[in-house]
UniProtKB/Swiss-Prot annotation:
Gene Ontology CC, one term: cytosolic large ribosomal subunit
Name recorded for this polypeptide: Large ribosomal subunit protein uL30
GO biological process: translation
UniProt keywords, alphabetically: Ribonucleoprotein, Ribosomal protein
GO molecular-function terms, A-Z: structural constituent of ribosome
Family affiliation: Belongs to the universal ribosomal protein uL30 family.
Highest taxon in the source lineage: Bacteria
UniProt cross-references to Gene3D superfamilies, sorted A to Z: Ribosomal protein L30, ferredoxin-like fold domain
InterPro entries in alphabetical order: Ribo_uL30_ferredoxin-like_sf, Ribosomal_uL30_bac-type, Ribosomal_uL30_ferredoxin-like
Amino acid sequence: MAKVKITLVKSLIGRKKDQIATVNALGLKKIGNIVQHEETPQISGMIKKVSYLLKVEEA
């Protein structure tokens, strides 16, 4: 499977609790944090849910 590099680019202030929980489940806490994950259906769904807060690149 391919790896993806995910960066949090927008703040979580004022977001719904489920969106904050999704970002935290991806391992992101602060703006500018970067994590790498395998591109599984679960991770893809989480990225889709909060895509407007993230920057996603191939790793």
